[in-house]
Amino acid sequence: MANLNWSYEGENGPEHWSKLYPIANGDNQSPIDIKTKEVKHDASLKPISVSYNPATAKEIVNVSHNFQVNFEDKDNQSVLKGGPFTGSFRLRQFHFHWGTADDHGSEHTVDGVKYSSELHIVHWNSEKYSSFSEAAEKPDGLAIIAVFIKAGQANPGLQKVIDALSSIKTKGKKAPFANFDPSLLIPQSSDYWSYHGSLTHPPLHESVTWIIYREPISASSEQLAKFRSLLSTAEGEKASSILHNHRLPQPLKGRQVKASFK
């Protein structure tokens, strides 16, 4: 893997991303702080419907600033529908963001409240575009489900992911990751917020319709600590842990956040 020209700290940290990626100062950047008093209920927002085939889970990869679980996305075996969308969006991958301690780590915040971590389940508009990379640059290209994670009880649905981390300890490591349904990690309550935003790390494309569930899921402190035990460095390099990988909330710049609930 090429060396990253951006990071989460120091001279290539988030406050400097705009030097390499001017869109970092754009009008539709993510994450944001959701101010619940300013949110508008939108009766046209339908319930979110996900249908994921566990057989499409493929591999888990350490990408240096994070890890992700990738899915086979050649056809519509795993899709997201409903919500603000007319068509279906194909599942591509999921990943998490976290902080140095359990009292912060989520990227989105709610009335300033931070959660311990945040899950992002990434989908692309396969009805309109022919690949993830093409869709990622288009305003209507991506749909990302965000789920807040609160430190508390251990989450059995998360354990398979946690157990796989030891096999991808260092940057560039991959391991097979089969038979997993990420809908296990979606909260029971269907209440969500939605707005138009961006990827939360470079290239920061403003191509994302966000679906942010109101209800958090839980993970234990032990489970969350395993995220921080991953290394951003390759085997043989001086070890450096991925202690945090979250961007701070960005200005709303006139955007309207909508709620599926009153």
Swiss-Prot record:
Q: Where is the active site?
A: H65
- EC main class here is lyase
Positions of Zn(2+) binding: H95, H97, H120
Q: Which UniProt keywords apply?
A: Acetylation, Cytoplasm, Lyase, Metal-binding, Zinc
Question: SUPFAM superfamilies annotated for this entry?
Answer: Carbonic anhydrase
Q: How is its activity regulated?
A: Inhibited by acetazolamide.
EC number, UniProt record = 4.2.1.1, 4.2.1.69
Query: Catalytic activity, per the record?
Result: hydrogencarbonate + H(+) = CO2 + H2O; urea = cyanamide + H2O
Where in the cell does this protein reside? Cytoplasm
Start and end residues of each Alpha-carbonic anhydrase domain: 4-261
Q: What is its main location?
A: cytoplasm
Q: What InterPro entries does this protein map onto?
A: CA_dom, CA_dom_sf, Carbonic_anhydrase_a-class, Carbonic_anhydrase_a-class_CS
**Protein's job:** Catalyzes the reversible hydration of carbon dioxide. Can hydrate cyanamide to urea.
What is the recorded name of this protein?
Carbonic anhydrase 1
